[in-house]
């Protein structure tokens, strides 16, 4: 791996500002890394080297600009986020020929901040999956072990950051799709508070759950990117009209956790968590104590109902959102269709993969007459109870902590035939989306059995991303750094 591509985003930014590196050199290093690693990990669906180098040359011609906080930084974007003139497929055949004519709001902000967009990252189809095996185009491998999954649905973004293909990647998180792949690939991934980042230009899966966020190498890097993409947006009515704090300033000089109270929910530390995961996360909590944090027990009693609640709500919203893909206006159109009815039926049955079809059918069922009250309405009520659990817990602590996933990255194909087991892999991440609160996954070591990265999750109060970022920075600096992934 090039010395350049092993740098953190903030370290690269400093070198660019001092003109020790040019934007073209940074982009070229990442493109070379993509060329070397992509045949192994298959993290990307689209890479436009020509456009990236042209953008980097334009930046170099203008010179470093301190007002552009990502000046010259090469980044990748999950393929559910619209990038003008770049294919945006959502990992689905039904959108195989779709090219947006506009940038998503977060992409506009990234460009304005000087970021160089290299391409689009692979993902589970329409963000429905936990392994990136559901992509219609390729299966992404974990850079730590090419036989293991990178997690999902933002697996391409996580794998690309871990492999040094970019310095940051945007992902989306509907039920853990940033945090779980971050845990599996040994990166930092943050899901902001619902409404912190505009969803304009994001192809929707579950509109009340989806959030865009960064995957990076360090908490400082995540703070830098989040500070750019966050903020109000008149094009998204669900985007909160709140000022964005200076996340980087909030992290500056952070050296200990004195005065911080961390809550440990019993429901996240019991049976069902692999011993290597529990041990690594417990050791990280002990380190937090040594840094001055106070640790207290808390309870999130409705956690056992979270998986069922999430999948009812998410599938209902998906069935509604994906009704627009019909072969008429854009996307895949079945050429053999002889009638309008056949056009709808064949385009959707051939354009959508099996997992997406499963979720659409279940979602339509729970919304149908006679079943709405039995399923969707009850799920909405339990969702409110889950949120209240967090509000009650945060009366006793500042941050809630637990494993990101019950296990480390699993073998490709291991859960493909058991969708219910795959759904359970999100058991510790989905509650936060139902509650609309911010969460971050950070690496805390390698598993003693699997030798794969272990991720620990930090939950924060609404719009208090700064506290979990600061906690992750201080704790991350105190823990032994992970080595570079050996498989690439």
Swiss-Prot record:
Keyword Ligase part of the UniProt annotation: yes
Residues at the catalytic site: 78, 153, 177
Alphabetized PROSITE patterns for the sequence: AMIDASES
GO biological process: translation
InterPro entries: Amidase (IPR000120), Amidase_CS (IPR020556), Amidase_dom (IPR023631), AS_sf (IPR036928), GatA (IPR004412)
Domain of life: Bacteria
One function term, GO molecular function aspect: ATP binding
Catalytic function, reaction form: L-glutamyl-tRNA(Gln) + L-glutamine + ATP + H2O = L-glutaminyl-tRNA(Gln) + L-glutamate + ADP + phosphate + H(+)
EC number in record: 6.3.5.7
One GO CC term, this protein: glutamyl-tRNA(Gln) amidotransferase complex
Keywords annotated in UniProt: ATP-binding, Ligase, Nucleotide-binding, Protein biosynthesis
Known partners and oligomeric status: Heterotrimer of A, B and C subunits.
UniProt-listed HAMAP family: GatA (MF_00120)
Membership in a protein family: Belongs to the amidase family. GatA subfamily.
Listed PANTHER family: GLUTAMYL-TRNA(GLN) AMIDOTRANSFERASE SUBUNIT A, TRANSAMIDASE
Its biological purpose: Allows the formation of correctly charged Gln-tRNA(Gln) through the transamidation of misacylated Glu-tRNA(Gln) in organisms which lack glutaminyl-tRNA synthetase. The reaction takes place in the presence of glutamine and ATP through an activated gamma-phospho-Glu-tRNA(Gln).
Name of the protein described by the UniProt record: Glutamyl-tRNA(Gln) amidotransferase subunit A
Organism encoding this protein: Solidesulfovibrio magneticus (strain ATCC 700980 / DSM 13731 / RS-1)
Origin organism lineage: Bacteria, Pseudomonadati, Thermodesulfobacteriota, Desulfovibrionia, Desulfovibrionales
């Amino acid at each position: 791996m090039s010395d350049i591509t092993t740098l953190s985003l903030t370290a690269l930014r400093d070198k660019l500002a001092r003109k020790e590196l040019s934007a073209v050199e940074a982009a070229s290093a990442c493109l070379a890394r993509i060329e070397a690693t992509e045949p192994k990990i298959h993290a990307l669906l689209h890479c436009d080297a020509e456009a990236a180098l042209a953008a980097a040359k334009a930046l170099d011609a203008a010179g470093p600009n301190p007002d552009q906080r990502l000046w010259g930084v090469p980044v990748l974007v999950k393929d559910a986020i619209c990038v003008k003139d770049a294919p945006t497929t959502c990992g689905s055949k039904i959108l195989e020929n779709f090219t947006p004519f506009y940038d998503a709001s977060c992409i506009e902000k990234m460009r304005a901040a000087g970021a160089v967009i290299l391409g689009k990252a692979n993902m589970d189809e329409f963000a429905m999956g936990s392994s990136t095996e559901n992509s219609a185009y390729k299966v992404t491998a974990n850079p730590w072990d090419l036989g293991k999954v990178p997690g999902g649905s933002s697996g391409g973004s996580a794998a690309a950051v871990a492999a040094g293909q970019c310095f940051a990647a945007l992902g989306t998180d509907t039920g853990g799709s940033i945090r779980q792949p971050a845990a599996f690939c040994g990166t930092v991934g943050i899901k902001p508070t619902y409404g912190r980042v505009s969803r304009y230009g994001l192809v929707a899966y579950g509109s009340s759950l989806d959030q865009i966020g960064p995957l990076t190498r360090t908490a400082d890097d995540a703070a830098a990117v989040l500070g750019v993409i966050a903020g109000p947006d008149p094009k998204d009515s669900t985007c909160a009209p709140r000022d964005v704090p200076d996340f980087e300033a909030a992290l500056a000089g952070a050296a200990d956790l004195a005065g911080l109270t961390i809550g440990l929910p019993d429901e996240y530390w019991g049976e069902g968590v692999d011993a290597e995961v529990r041990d690594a996360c417990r050791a990280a909590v002990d380190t937090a104590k040594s840094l001055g944090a106070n640790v207290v027990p808390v309870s999130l009693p409705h956690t056992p109902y979270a998986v069922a609640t999430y999948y009812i709500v998410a599938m209902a919203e998906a069935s509604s959102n994906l009704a627009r893909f019909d072969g008429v206006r854009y996307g895949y159109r079945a050429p053999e269709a002889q009638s309008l009815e056949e056009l709808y039926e064949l385009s959707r049955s051939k354009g959508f993969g099996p997992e997406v079809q499963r979720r659409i059918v279940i979602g339509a069922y729970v919304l149908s007459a006679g079943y709405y009250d039995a399923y969707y309405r009850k799920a909405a009520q339990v969702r409110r109870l889950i949120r209240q659990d967090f509000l009650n817990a945060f009366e006793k602590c500042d941050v809630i902590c637990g494993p990101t996933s019950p296990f480390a990255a699993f073998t490709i194909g291991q859960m493909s035939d058991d969708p219910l087991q795959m759904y359970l892999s999100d058991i510790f991440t989905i509650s936060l989306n139902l509650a609309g609160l911010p969460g971050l996954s950070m690496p805390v070591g390698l598993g003693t059995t699997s030798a794969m990265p272990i991720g620990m999750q930090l939950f924060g109060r609404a719009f208090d991303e700064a506290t979990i970022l600061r906690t992750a920075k201080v704790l991350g600096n105190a823990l032994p750094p992970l080595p570079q992934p050996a498989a690439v």
